[in-house]
Amino acid sequence: MLIEILLLAGAYLLGSIPTGLLLAKAAGVDIRTTGSGNIGATNVYRTLGRSVGIATLVGDCLKGLIPVLAAKYLGMTDLWIALAGLAAFLGHVYTVFLGFKGGKGVATALGVFLGLAPLAVLIALGIFVAVVATSRYISLGSITAAAAMPPVVAFLSGRPPLVGVTVVIALLVIWKHRENIQRLRAGTENRFKA
């Protein structure tokens, strides 16, 4: 049990590393005061360009993937594997390093799900791409893909710990997008420009 607790603590701390903030600071920008003010890959991309945005996406994704792979490598049960992913995700959205104010969690959730349910990620990614291609709203694509994950994971795996954690992560991703939802409804949300 000690190893599992240490893994969860490590996963949370890894998830708490504010990748976008650190990369933006290295470029001389405080991302929290630029664009949307969010520390995630979309705002970094819009503010600092493709390369820094992609680096943020990859870094945030790895924060979710590494703890899941570590738990699998250590031979932990589905419950602990799923909790390791959840801990990393919670670290990102409620980072201890920024007063528990983090990002929206999309990229970190992607990493978690790549480790937990890679086939479900492919389906959700297809949904994300279709929504963004037709609407040009990254936020709408993220919300729709998050909403699709629980039923897809339930259908493909049916394993209660994975489904439970997927529901929690999906709900939190949608909750973290509540301001985007308001802007979408008001017609003031920023569209994606490639």
Curated annotation (Swiss-Prot):
Gene Ontology biological process terms from the UniProt entry: phospholipid biosynthetic process
Enzyme class: transferase
Keywords recorded for this protein, A-Z: Cell inner membrane, Cell membrane, Lipid biosynthesis, Lipid metabolism, Membrane, Phospholipid biosynthesis, Phospholipid metabolism, Transferase, Transmembrane, Transmembrane helix
GO CC annotation: plasma membrane
Claim: Ribonucleoprotein is one of the keywords in the record: no
InterPro entries in the record: G3P_acylTferase_PlsY (IPR003811)
Membrane topology: Multi-pass membrane protein
Record's catalysed reaction(s): an acyl phosphate + sn-glycerol 3-phosphate = a 1-acyl-sn-glycero-3-phosphate + phosphate
Subcellular location(s) per record: Cell inner membrane
Quaternary organization: Probably interacts with PlsX.
Function: Catalyzes the transfer of an acyl group from acyl-phosphate (acyl-PO(4)) to glycerol-3-phosphate (G3P) to form lysophosphatidic acid (LPA). This enzyme utilizes acyl-phosphate as fatty acyl donor, but not acyl-CoA or acyl-ACP.
Family statement: Belongs to the PlsY family.
Protein name: Glycerol-3-phosphate acyltransferase
Species of the source: Geobacter metallireducens (strain ATCC 53774 / DSM 7210 / GS-15)
